[in-house]
Amino acid sequence: MIDLLIIAGPTAVGKTDISIKLAEKLNGEIISADSMQIYKYMDIGSAKITKDEMKGIPHHLIDVVEPHEEFNVSSFKTLAEKSIKDIWSRGKLPIIAGGTGLYINSLIYNYDFTDADRDEKYREYLTKLSEDKGKEYVHSLLKDIDEKSYEKLYPNDLKRVVRALEVYKITGKSISEYTKENEKKLYDIPYNVNYFVLNMNREVLYERINKRVDIMMGKGLIEEVKKLESMGYTPDMQSMKGIGYKEVLFYLNGDISLDEAIYLIKKGSRNYAKRQLTWFRKDKRSIWIDKDKYTFEEEIVDKIIKMVKDK
């Protein structure tokens, strides 16, 4: 069975530094579980790790697709499983590091995307329907077949609405039912999982997030978005809807001021961190590490190593 170490947590909590230190001590390689860092050219807004910051540790699933290409949890699972096997086959420890909870769950709950993968014709039909009758109409189709998704999703979130309708068409089940059934396959995975979630005082975390946004602006986030626009990447693309990118696009289009854009990026990032923590709390397998209780990161690293070895 393959040993798999997972270092998760909210944005700006410090997953990168901890995972690199663990990789150095455990002879590991890191697989990124970040839904934005998979895109090429989107470096500043995604807080993508630099080559120097990697400290010689190989990183996987960073810069793997162009910004116009679609990438989803099924794509991640396929590539991550391939990387895990490759790393393990070379006598090294695969370390998953990131904050996209769905990506992590696709591995440790062995989500099966083969039965309900895609129905392109149905997707095209629903997209055309939204253009003809409006997003609200397509959203209303959920009411009778998947009330939970109907209440949870907004009409403007067309991509997720279409996905929920697609899953129901293929399986006859709501997307939440389908997910629960996949989660029952928990112990069918070929991994010995050690799952840690880093956390810290909420106010301190929010301060770190605000500071990170200021640093991004100083590094040239606006210039990065301008360059992406000049390369032909548009606001309707999945990648350009990421936090930081969509707000700067609003600013560049004259819809909001620069101060408003910065405010919205900070607010959106804080809200995202809150959602991440809520997601991770649902998983009873995860072991939480409160960073506030430690003076040095090395203490956290040593604690994780001890817990892994004592398991």
From Swiss-Prot:
InterPro entries: Dimethylallyltransferase, IPT, P-loop_NTPase. It catalyses: adenosine(37) in tRNA + dimethylallyl diphosphate = N(6)-dimethylallyladenosine(37) in tRNA + diphosphate. Keywords: ATP-binding, Magnesium, Nucleotide-binding, Transferase, tRNA processing. Substrate binds at T11, A12, V13, G14, K15, T16. The keyword Magnesium applies. It comes from the Bacteria. NCBIfam families: miaA. Monomer. This is tRNA dimethylallyltransferase. It comes from Clostridium botulinum (strain 657 / Type Ba4). The lineage of its organism: Bacteria, Bacillati, Bacillota, Clostridia, Eubacteriales. The gene is miaA.
